[in-house]
A protein has these predicted regions:
Chain B
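Hydrophobic cores of alpha-helical transmembrane segments in multi-pass integral membrane proteins
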Residues: 91, 117-132, 158-177, 225-245, ...
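Ferredoxin-type iron-sulfur electron-transfer modules and their immediate structural context
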Residues: 1-65, 350, 358, 364-365, ...
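Flexible metal-binding regulatory segments at protein termini and peripheral loops
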Residues: 1-2, 92, 96, 383
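Iron-sulfur-cluster electron-transfer modules
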Residues: 21, 38, 48-245, 249
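Membrane-interfacial loop-to-transmembrane-helix junctions in polytopic alpha-helical membrane proteins
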Residues: 14-20, 61, 153-156, 214-224, ...
Length: 576, 383
């Protein structure tokens, strides 16, 4: 152990760590540990001067192992690995002790938090001694992409990829392209025709020699790993295709909330209560009529149907407010004598041109009636003297009055929800869903179109409710990410993965069943299991499960983990 | 019981000048910035809301538009340019038309052509009547302006003035009673003890003569102009109703004429200032002009101008014939101005505004009393 030269670097993270943990005490303590050549405390280790300090120490003091006591390794492990590499030693000679998320951010007691930081630093020093040099590897990248979903996001991504000269397989469940946008008439806030937007994209997709469109098709299975996927696709009733692709883009869209679930709105029971998509259809056909064939005079849009209500969906569906305002414009231009009300909770008019659109809709004398979150307007039959089909009763918040308004057509602004087959898709392509069923991105802000599965991207409303500009931007971002991988030609595979010692493997196949990434193959001939290193995420399930102890995780060897645990325990026992 | 919203009311109020109310999104900046807005009358936002939603009954019993003097600060602060000040002005016009039981006011506000035609008709009838009187029944001569053998005898004109005054007072009185009914009488939840009416009655003359709430506005000039106009008008009214003999005498009676000249300067100065302001649109409260605003100001300038002209023609130039002709023309302005504008149009506010100050204080007292009663009933019993 004494032959190691370890550097320990304690980050103050401004005051994030230092305000609770005594960082100087941690570095003073580390200095005395066996094998530690240098220990320092610094304001921001991740800053350029912080990294320079490490690099200089490695070179001048001939350090061969580095411990950084700072934030979570998810945050800055790549940063410090790079520093090690720059200094000329193997990047895996690094170990991080998380004294921010695990100490200063979660504890109030400065003394106890400092004690815990000392224990974690000790454990990291004990562990890093056993780190082994690991090398990254590269595999080939297949340039074809599988795009799931022929809506505006899928079409856009397919065009971006094919325009760059790369082949695309566009899989659409329906018998036509266009997705949900094909059901829309005009679009907010500029009142452009959705049909015009789509028609051009669909024509270009169909004409592109690089895009193969598979209608009435669904993905059956996906195997392999980034750069080397194999997809089984069912085409039509009984056709099948197998394609090799390097990347997968999931753009499967949303489905609308089922308005029947909110019973007292009477959708399905009251003839003139319709959903926003039904009104879209009327607008596209140019025939806006009540069920009785009368031209309606009073239109009421009820916002947040299924959205922003903990009983249904707590989230905002983002597009319904502007869509409802759009109806105001379309209705008043089709029927100049009509009256339009918007029964809303809050007006969400974010986005380019939307606040202005809201203002213009107000100027057209649309009546905005605010109802309280947690309440719902009530639809009741009209009286014999009324010139309307129904009355809507609502406690109007801005006036504080109980009011009723006449209505001929009630339009329920149904929100977006995850598709019924979202869970199947997620399972097929190994991505996760959040509590509402939306696919989870790699990072909500910094990596919005990648997923935790390398090579699988998401775009459009399958990720979360959003409008056309957001969907298109995501599709283009995903295409750019895919093209980036294609242009590099090779895929870098992390050096951390599990390995099977074939001499000790009994062929029980327990690991094959357990692996969440389908990264373990079973060779029937040799009766041994083998890890596909490019697919392995180093989660460690197989390592823990193997009854023969035949599997070891690189960078997570028993020796490394046990010495880390011993580090904590030794420190604790030294404290009595 | 739910109140029925009427989407047509916004359209109706457009005729009264409320063109921008639909833009309001209820941020409440207007009520926050208004120097007059205070509990329990937080305006103009809530009035804007009643109008947007077409809560006609609420609006009809709402005194808040009369509590507003239109200093314009709300319109200047409004982030949506919904012109709350002008909307309140429009609601005053609409309320005037609703207080009026004859429907004439509604006709005038909705059609300036009808108002103009009515003014011309009354003017012509007045002219014809005075000419007939002068030539046929009065026994005077066109060459005599005042004293023995005057074309229009003071006594006859005085009687005519009082008859006209009584008719106007009757119309206005009925409308004021309707205003009381809509705002206080109809509301069964308000209990106002008769003594309160007496106790607060002093508010009527106070607000009429000082317009002190207007003085609370950050800008003092509009208040000063308005006060000068009102005092000049009142002075002239008093002179004509009680001192017509002195005004119309052969000699200059400075005790009466001095006030007359002051009032004329006040009337002409302020109305020309207002006209110029409405043309230039520099001050917020002059930015929007309804047709009735123009008619009112033009009539005022006309009446004040012909009034001083007859005086000058007689007393300075001793031109009796010209003075008599201008006198008849003057009456052709006075009668429609008082007869039509006071009960049915813009000038009705001389009664409605002080009344609203008075009624609103009664309302406020009753509301406070009601809240106290509710609080007392809801309070836990002593152990």
């Amino acid at each position: 152990m004494e032959d190691r030269r370890i550097g320990v670097y304690v980050c103050n993270c401004g005051t994030n760590i230092a305000k609770v943990v005594d960082c100087d005490a941690v570095s003073d303590f580390a200095k005395k540990l066996p094998g530690v050549a240098v220990a320092r405390s610094y304001k921001y280790m991740c800053s350029n001067p912080g990294q320079e300090m490490i690099i200089q120490d490695i070179r001048e003091l001939s350090l061969d192992r580095v411990v950084v006591a700072a934030c979570s390794p998810r945050m800055h492990e790549p940063t410090f690995r790079k520093a090690l590499q720059t200094a000329g030693i193997n990047p895996y000679f690094l170990e991080m002790a998380n004294i921010r998320e695990q100490c200063s951010w979660v504890h109030d007691d400065a003394r106890a938090a400092t004690d815990k930081a000392l224990a974690l630093a000790h454990a990291a020093v004990r562990r890093v001694v056993h780190h082994e040099p690991l090398e990254k590897r590269f595999v080939d990248m297949c340039p074809a992409t599988l795009v799931l979903g022929g809506g505006i996001a899928g079409l856009t991504a397919a065009l971006e990829l094919s325009d760059a000269g790369q082949p695309v397989f566009l899989v659409e469940k329906d018998d036509h392209l266009g997705g949900n946008l094909a059901r829309v008439d005009l679009t907010a806030p500029y009142l452009d025709s959705a049909r015009d937007m789509l028609a051009d994209r669909i024509r270009r997709v169909l004409e592109s020699p690089k895009i193969e469109v598979l209608l009435r098709s669904t993905l059956q299975s996906l195997s392999g790993f980034v750069g080397n996927f194999r997809a089984e696709i069912r085409v039509g009733a009984d056709g099948a295709r197998t394609v090799d692709v390097g990347s997968v883009l999931v753009a499967t869209g949303f489905r609308e909330f089922d308005a029947r679930r909110i019973e007292h709105y009477g959708y399905g029971r009251l003839p003139n209560v319709v959903t926003s998509f039904e009104l879209e259809r009327m607008l596209r056909e140019g025939r806006i009529l009540t069920r009785g064939g009368r031209v309606p005079k009073y239109f009421a849009m009820i916002h947040c149907v299924g959205s922003r209500n903990p009983e249904y969906h707590g989230y905002c569906s983002r597009v319904c407010c502007m869509t409802a305002l759009k109806y105001g414009h379309e209705i008043k231009s089709a029927l100049p004598g009509a009256y339009v009300y918007d029964l809303y909770i809050d007006m969400h008019a974010f986005g380019k041109g939307c606040e202005d659109f809201y203002r213009r809709t107000a100027e057209m004398k649309t009546m905005f009636l605010m109802y309280a979150k947690g309440t719902t307007p009530e639809i009741v039959p009209s009286g014999p003297d009324d010139d309307c089909e129904m009355l809507i009763k609502v406690h109007e918040v801005l006036s504080g009055e109980e009011i009723e308004v006449p209505a001929d057509l009630v339009v329920l602004m149904v929100g977006m929800e995850a598709r019924e087959d979202a869970a199947d898709v997620a399972h097929l392509v190994s991505i996760s869903q959040d509590k509402d069923g939306w696919f989870i991105e790699s990072h909500p802000k910094l990596d919005p179109v990648a997923t935790t599965t390398e090579g699988v991207f998401i775009a459009g409303t399958c990720q979360a409710p959003k409008g056309i500009p957001g969907s298109v931007a995501q599709a283009e971002a995903a295409a750019a990410r895919i093209l980036g991988k294609i242009s590099r030609g090779k895929i870098e595979v992390d050096a951390v993965f599990a390995e099977v010692d074939e001499t000790r493997c009994s062929g029980c196949r327990m690991c094959n069943e357990l692996c969440p990434y389908a990264a373990i193959e079973y060779d029937a001939a040799t009766k041994r299991s083998r890890v596909i290193s490019a697919v392995c995420k180093a989660c460690g399930c197989c390592v823990a499960a193997c009854p023969s102890g035949a599997i070891q995780g690189r960078h997570f060897t028993d020796r490394q983990i046990f010495s880390q645990i011993e580090g904590v325990l030794e420190w604790a026992s030294s404290q009595g | 019981m739910a109140i029925r919203a009427n989407p047509r009311l916004v359209e109706e109020l457009e005729h009264y000048g409320a063109e921008d109310v639909a833009k309001c999104y209820h941020c409440g900046n207007c009520s926050a910035v208004c120097p007059f807005s205070r509990e329990p009358f937080l305006f103009p936002r809530k009035s804007m809301r009643y109008l947007q939603m077409g809560l006609e009954e609420k609006l009809l019993g709402n005194l808040e538009p009369w509590l507003c003097y239109y200093c314009g600060e709300c319109s200047e602060e409004c982030p949506r340019e919904a012109e709350p000040g002008e909307t309140m002005m429009s609601m005053r016009r609409w309320l005037t038309s609703r207080y009026d039981f004859t429907g004439i006011s509604k006709l005038f506000y909705r059609s300036w052509k009808a108002e103009l035609a009515a003014i011309l008709l009354v003017a012509l009838l007045t002219g014809a009547g005075f000419l007939l009187f002068g030539f046929r029944w009065g026994g005077g001569h066109l060459g005599v302006y005042a004293g023995e053998g005057a074309f229009l005898t003071t006594g006859a004109v005085h009687v005519f003035d009082w008859i006209l005054g009584c008719v106007l007072a009757a119309f206005l009185g009925i409308n004021c009673a309707r205003m009381w009914w809509f705002s206080i009488g109809k509301d069964r939840t308000l209990r106002i003890p008769p003594l309160a009416y007496l106790r607060q009655a002093f508010l009527l003359p106070v607000h009429f003569f000082t317009q002190k709430r207007y003085a609370e506005c950050g800008k003092k000039r509009p208040w000063a102009i308005h006060l000068a106009l009102m005092l000049s008008y009142t002075t002239m009214l008093v002179l004509i109703m009680f001192f017509l003999h002195a005004m119309h005498s052969e000699r200059t009676v400075w005790a009466a004429h001095g006030f007359g000249y002051l009032a004329t300067i006040g009337l002409l100065g302020t109305s020309i200032y207002a006209l110029r302001g409405r043309i230039r649109k520099e001050e917020t409260h002059y930015k929007h002009s309804h047709e009735t605003d123009w008619i009112f100001l033009i009539l005022l300038v006309f009446v004040a101008g012909t009034g001083i002209l007859q005086n000058v023609l007689y007393r300075v130039f001793h031109l009796d014939v010209a003075a008599n002709v201008v006198y008849v023309v003057h009456m052709m302005g006075v009668v429609p101005m008082l007869g039509l504008e006071v009960p049915f149009s813009k000038w009705a506010h001389l009664a409605y505004r002080p009344l609203a100050m008075y009624f609103s204080e009664l309302q406020a007292e009753a509301i406070r009393e009601r809240e106290r009663a509710v609080a007392a009933a809801g309070a836990p019993l002593p152990a």
